[in-house]
Curated annotation (Swiss-Prot):
Domain of life: Eukaryota
Cofactor detail note: Binds 2 [4Fe-4S] clusters per subunit.
EC numbers, comma separated: 7.1.1.-
Topology of the protein relative to the lipid bilayer: Peripheral membrane protein
Major site of localization recorded for this protein: plastid
Keyword Membrane on entry: yes
Gene this chain is encoded by: ndhI
Protein species of origin: Encelia californica
Gene3D superfamilies from the UniProt entry: 3.30.70.3270
Family annotation (NCBIfam families): ndhI (TIGR00403), NuoI (TIGR01971), PRK05888.1-3 (NF004537)
Residues that coordinate or bind [4Fe-4S] cluster 2: 74, 104, 107, 110
Binding-site list for [4Fe-4S] cluster 1: 64, 67, 70, 114
InterPro entries for this protein: 4Fe4S_Fe-S-bd (IPR017896), 4Fe4S_Fe_S_CS (IPR017900), NADH_quinone_OxRdtase_chainI (IPR010226), NDHI (IPR004497)
Protein name: NAD(P)H-quinone oxidoreductase subunit I, chloroplastic
Length: 166
């Protein structure tokens, strides 16, 4: 055959193949148009976190025995535990406990290994501030329970997320 005719046939085949690929991509786009939106309007709508969510740490001062297990298991040695040895009863007395959430990686090791369960993870994740020194929480700030998202009437909570089809 003539070289010009074979080039024209190859060009036609490439055009048909390109149109097929464009059509396949367009069909995928149309299949996604039927789904519910995944994004939420954050300050006005909030997701309810799972029970395994690792948020801000809650601390109960009365349960702590100042054993410093939380400091030893922390990958960055973050919790600061100040204690005094009571010589008459031979026990440690906790003076101060603080965590800097600007440095904390929320790994949960301190909560998992605490022998008295004085540490727990809350559902609070809004820790933003303009001054990073405000992220250093002492035992009083750590002892405050966060307001539950469910109980806040100003925020619409989203209970069920649309499930993704894979």
């Amino acid at each position: 055959m003539f070289p010009m005719v074979t080039e024209f046939m190859n060009y036609g085949q490439q055009t048909v193949r390109a149109a097929r690929y464009i059509g396949q991509g367009f069909m995928i786009t149309l299949s996604h148009a039927n789904r519910l939106p995944v994004t939420i309007q954050y300050p006005y709508e909030k997701l309810i976190t799972s029970e395994r969510f690792r948020g801000r740490i809650h601390f109960e001062f009365d349960k702590c025995i100042a054993c410093e297990v939380c400091v030893r298991v922390c990958p960055i040695d973050l919790p600061v535990v100040d204690w005094k040895l009571e010589t008459d009863i031979r026990k440690k007395r906790l003076l101060n406990y603080s965590i800097d959430f600007g440095i904390c990686i929320f790994c949960g090791n301190c909560v998992e290994y605490c022998p008295t369960n004085c540490l727990s993870m809350t559902e609070e994740y809004e820790l933003s501030t303009y001054d990073r020194h405000e992220l250093n929480y002492n035992q009083i700030a750590l002892g405050r329970l966060p307001m539950s998202i469910i109980d806040d009437y100003t925020i619409r909570t989203i209970l069920n997320l649309p499930e993704r089809k894979t």
